[in-house]
């Protein structure tokens, strides 16, 4: 074991100077540049042949999806606009039908009420004419009774006042003149 301690490894250059950092050694620059160029060409080929087409495919698929979604949105907007127009047209037609039904019903009810009113007016006119005839007949009968009663009363009054029974024709003429007068 003593032998392992006696040997030392030399890491430095001769004369106590250290060796330069290997990437900065000028005698290996050319081979490093060639290696770097080969690595960049290989990386470029890999990226351009493998990675970029995949990324481009993803971008194209995304753009196509966006365009398809936009086209679908436009189509659905058109359909919803058509559905809204159809709904508004149906609503307008329903309102017009309801208005027509209301007008027709109102006119029918007004016509029925007018016919009923005319029938009632005719019945009332007939009843009124009958009542007027009855009143006229009753008045005439009452007036004829009044004449008789007035004649009897006048005769009685004259007999009471004068003491003589008056002539019935004269009393009748006097009562008639008074009633007409």
UniProtKB/Swiss-Prot annotation:
One of its GO terms (molecular function) is proton-transporting ATP synthase activity, rotational mechanism. Residues 1-12 have a biased composition (Low complexity). One of its GO terms (cellular component) is proton-transporting ATP synthase complex. The keyword Ion transport applies. It is a single-pass membrane protein. Its main location: membrane. The chain crosses the membrane at residues 33-53. It comes from the Bacteria. Residues 1-20 are annotated as: Disordered. Keywords: ATP synthesis, Cell inner membrane, Cell membrane, CF(0), Hydrogen ion transport, Ion transport, Membrane, Transmembrane, Transmembrane helix, Transport. It holds the Pfam family ATP-synt_B. It is found in: Cell inner membrane. F-type ATPases have 2 components, F(1) - the catalytic core - and F(0) - the membrane proton channel. F(1) has five subunits: alpha(3), beta(3), gamma(1), delta(1), epsilon(1). F(0) has three main subunits: a(1), b(2) and c(10-14). The alpha and beta chains form an alternating ring which encloses part of the gamma chain. F(1) is attached to F(0) by a central stalk formed by the gamma and epsilon chains, while a peripheral stalk is formed by the delta and b chains. Belongs to the ATPase B chain family. F(1)F(0) ATP synthase produces ATP from ADP in the presence of a proton or sodium gradient. F-type ATPases consist of two structural domains, F(1) containing the extramembraneous catalytic core and F(0) containing the membrane proton channel, linked together by a central stalk and a peripheral stalk. During catalysis, ATP synthesis in the catalytic domain of F(1) is coupled via a rotary mechanism of the central stalk subunits to proton translocation. Component of the F(0) channel, it forms part of the peripheral stalk, linking F(1) to F(0). The b'-subunit is a diverged and duplicated form of b found in plants and photosynthetic bacteria. This is ATP synthase subunit b 2. It comes from Rhodopseudomonas palustris (strain BisA53).
